[in-house]
Amino acid sequence: MALDHAQPGQVIDLEPLGAALRASLSHAILKTRTLELMRVVLRAGEALPPHHIHGEMTLLCIEGAAEIDLGASTCQLRARQLLLLPARVQYAVRALQDTSLLLTIRLPAGRGARHCVVDDPKFATASASMKVA
């Protein structure tokens, strides 16, 4: 089943989900040959396991707060804060509060849908579904 992605010229609403966050799911927003955007929704205490992306990426905290574990260091993202991660850097995300994040990935040429390498076999490629621990 194909995912319903945004089309060129389509306006995308990225407002905070507010009270609807707890019932919302992570989902792909758009995907092109070189770019992928996903809205990642995590409830307080939920986490994405350690993994890395082959391309550069950004995480924008739309609402809530999350701890980003970069192995040697950690940082916190709060609403309206952005973090740039270079390609192939392992990271994990843990929600400190109910949180939604905009994940933007620059896909390297030739990688297509197989951009995500995950150390936890329960975690599927983000395009298909975002599984949390």
Residue map of PLM features:
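Ligand-binding loop in jelly-roll beta-barrel domains
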Residues: A87-R111
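Structural motif
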Residues: A65-E67, T74, Q90, S100
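Short beta-strand His + acidic residue motifs that chelate non-heme Fe in jelly-roll/DSBH
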Residues: L48-P50, I68-D69, L85, Q90-L96
